């Protein structure tokens, strides 16, 4: 019976992925477990959740090399007014990598802040609609304004 070592199998997987997925891909995902280290690289996880149940349906490790991260992070934060952190949805350009020791990962090359802004606007509309349906959206408008001590006569 012929057999392969684990390294040989992983090398075969790497070469196959390089041949089948040689391009860059734009993917939509939610950021999870975003952290940077002393070298300036950013390590994170990309997740996708089922919209109905909120259960995870896909997950991948990702990284952003420091030469990209030091440009991408401020660009994203200035464009969106939001921190580059876990829990936000992003549209990123990635390459698929496979390393014999570390396994499958996605390397980030670029980001589209407009996608995140659109998602933030959608979530805001959903929250406002929910508050309106619950009858709490205009509760503060119905209160009489209170004068502060400085304005009392």
Residue positions per predicted region:
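Acidic, two-metal ion nucleic-acid-processing modules in DNA metabolism proteins
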Residues: 1-153
